[in-house]
């Protein structure tokens, strides 16, 4: 599978690159970012996947979070895909910011006209890791995942649906219980249809309640002044309650004065990289 390099920039001794490829799952051209730390020049490194939030491309995280310093320090290859298929010419794909383009929600759609292209779940859990493992100096056995908002939801469900696949998981302001919030209801009804029982397969709170896999340590940071926390889109309390009931270890940090933005992410990104490095470099 041919990769086309779009850009390459030296950063903290490593290289921040962006590539384009033709996705089999999504049936369109996709871009992803990959950071190769200095350690990747001499051997295989663990892989850490970042999933971005609504409206984002592969660019937001790599240009705003400043994660490269910590990734360089801990020797992690960090991969950041786009948030949806692009340019599929599906009627309505560009009509709203929270559905369609830039809003794939990391599910495999089952409804027309989305089901042929909107397969972000399989893309981030199967196709992209296979592509990364084949083309970059990563250790396929050492992989973790994290994300923000819609991407925090994506990271949590990918980890919970695949016990043992990821060494660790973390999230910034994740959409924790999408079956109960308006963003989730809109996306899931569009991509997965009206049967709400099918939605639960992509809801972190529902997945935790049924989880029986190997222990996974979860780190979540949430800004206390996040407008989407106060208006009921994120619902972290439901997720924490489910984790507590199932005795799944979760560190939940409510950060005073912080909002939903990349300023919040940039403040705590090094903590998250450290969290993953602890498991990936063990």
Swiss-Prot record:
GO aspect biological process, one term: formaldehyde catabolic process
Function: Serine hydrolase involved in the detoxification of formaldehyde.
Subunit structure: Homodimer.
Organism field: Mus musculus
Modified sites of kind N-acetylalanine: 2
CC annotations in GO: cytoplasmic vesicle
Modified residues (N6-acetyllysine): 200
Locations listed in the record: Cytoplasm; Cytoplasmic vesicle
Upper taxonomic lineage: Eukaryota, Metazoa, Chordata, Craniata, Vertebrata
SUPFAM superfamilies, per the entry: alpha/beta-Hydrolases
Designated name of the protein: S-formylglutathione hydrolase
